[in-house]
């Protein structure tokens, strides 16, 4: 076997059964991985110097093909209602067959770290058969100093072989695509998909399993910090504005997607960003756009024209086009990936029913209720001409990545909020003046003004009213914001229609939360919508 690059000779690939590979390239730089990717026909150079790769059949994650090994250690720890079990016997067969499949191949290795706080960091080795995958994960995770690579010992190993096709009958999986996580032994096997995001989210899943046992809260969120050290966390599902609203030139970006909250404060799990690029423009998101115009960035499934110029408006391959770049490509990004305890938590929702106010203050119990609910709404497909919104509840604002029961994360969050006196706000970036199809999108200018008032502390000093449907506190007036939009009912021409819509949304919340009723205390149960609170 040929070996290239700096690495620890005591932890070579032979130690995990990959000793039959033709060659291994350890910890290659971006420039070297560009050369390998292009030489091997995996990717193309864009006119601006980014690297464009296509993922073929899979242009997004495959959550139905993700499994967790169910063994003596994980049996009582995993939320099996939400995670698919795989027997140790099936995993052993899958591992043996994948290792055999790797024989004779050229492999790429990156030794990286998940977690910017030293005491809670996860040394992670990622083994790939694609050079561009190696660059992708090098961009996304935290890169150790070169000197540290000679003594690097991984606690998690990910083996990603897209050319391997699983056998459902033999391996206990669903299709030829498989993402199998052995949490006990720190091994993730990925086969049958070229979508690079599977590697990133596998690290997140493992951290979401390990950290709560250490009293550390893992979060699917973005985070930033102000000049006075006032950190803020932004929870929210896709399309709610998490990335856009946390990108604030007046504040330092800690990270855009995954963080932990420990006894020392918050810290990024990653060393890069994986941003959506569909309809990306220099005018709307200049910092993200600039990353797509430089060497080192990976563009995933972005259409190029004949001159190799990216066309970010073209979603013909997928709407889920992405770019992956290291954090330092963003001008105001944190160099440490860490900050103190958050002063503010923002929970974002895009309510397409037009019922929720643009901002509401949450008590710790209400914050846990809305965290466990993880609500947003998607608008129906225009091809069917349907204008009825579809409610989406993804617990902890990231159900696919949460191995443990949501109540574990919820109780941890509630405790941290109470202990550190964090101000919590629910922000609706969805519709006002009616539901989707009748109303209009919440003005981004108003959202930013409300957010600025919340982060500065100004919003805590205004007069509030209790929302008659959800019970949370809603500001009556805020400087610089049209007071009319603060009361959603008043923005509807047909008040009766609003009441009907509100009752419908409340009933959806109650039905969704039923599965958590037995796992929370009375205070959280009383935070449910429909529980009327005195108005003033």
Curated annotation (Swiss-Prot):
Q: What are its E.C. numbers?
A: 4.1.1.49
Q: Which cofactor does it need?
A: Mn(2+)
Record keywords, A-Z = ATP-binding, Cytoplasm, Decarboxylase, Gluconeogenesis, Lyase, Manganese, Metal-binding, Nucleotide-binding
Predominantly, its location class is cytoplasm
Q: Which reaction does it catalyse?
A: oxaloacetate + ATP = phosphoenolpyruvate + ADP + CO2
User: Which residues of this UniProt protein bind ATP?
Assistant: 201, 220, 236-244, 285, 322, 447
The UniProt note on the cofactor reads as follows: Binds 1 Mn(2+) ion per subunit.
Q: In which pathway does it act?
A: Carbohydrate biosynthesis; gluconeogenesis
Its Gene Ontology cellular component terms are: cytosol
GO terms, biological process: gluconeogenesis
Q: Which domain of life does the UniProt lineage start with? A: Bacteria
- Where does this protein hold Mn(2+)? 201, 220, 257
Where is this gene product found? Answer: Cytoplasm
Q: Cite the binding residues for substrate.
A: 61, 195, 201, 322
Q: Which GO terms describe its molecular function?
A: ATP binding; metal ion binding; phosphoenolpyruvate carboxykinase (ATP) activity
Which EC class is the enzyme in? lyase
Spell out the SUPFAM superfamilies in the cross-references: PEP carboxykinase N-terminal domain, PEP carboxykinase-like
Q: Please give the function described in this protein's UniProt entry.
A: Involved in the gluconeogenesis. Catalyzes the conversion of oxaloacetate (OAA) to phosphoenolpyruvate (PEP) through direct phosphoryl transfer between the nucleoside triphosphate and OAA.
Q: Which family does it belong to?
A: Belongs to the phosphoenolpyruvate carboxykinase (ATP) family.
PANTHER family named among the record's database cross-references: PHOSPHOENOLPYRUVATE CARBOXYKINASE (ATP), PHOSPHOENOLPYRUVATE CARBOXYKINASE ATP
NCBIfam families registered for this protein in UniProt: pckA (TIGR00224), PRK09344.1-2 (NF006820), PRK09344.1-3 (NF006821), PRK09344.1-4 (NF006822)
Protein name as annotated: Phosphoenolpyruvate carboxykinase (ATP)
Question: Which species does this protein come from?
Answer: Rhizobium etli (strain CIAT 652)
